[in-house]
């Protein structure tokens, strides 16, 4: 199963390249990058073909992925896929990955087709790693790149393997066992687990 680090390694490896898919005739579009990574790189089998970026939150919901809408204070977690509105410039929206949260509150993103080349809507662009600032009104602007700001709509999260969650679950189960022992034996106080058994002190 794919880990978060697997995804981050993959999207970083594609920076400055053009990511395309066989179902999109318009070259390196922003959504083609997402579809390339989520369907064709061996990480996931999530189909984001034949869809504009603006509709990807709906597609994600159809694929049973966790979808979150921007509420003025939250922000896309690392490795989430965010969606923005590009009005009034065009109605197709924009999409990319959140690659890192920075100490100054900015977000490093990896996204495609932000070079503003004249044929961007017909042939797309390249994958770029940039820094953005997210304001409370949803304005998602570039810090180190020349391109128009957009409005953040929301994001979706991917089904990663999570060993830390499994470890926490095990610890909670141990706590339940400990509580059960105390209730059955009428004992209170401290104890330890040794070899899977609870020993009262």
Predicted regions and their residues:
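Extracellular cell-wall/glycan-interacting regions and their flexible linkers
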Residues: 1-201
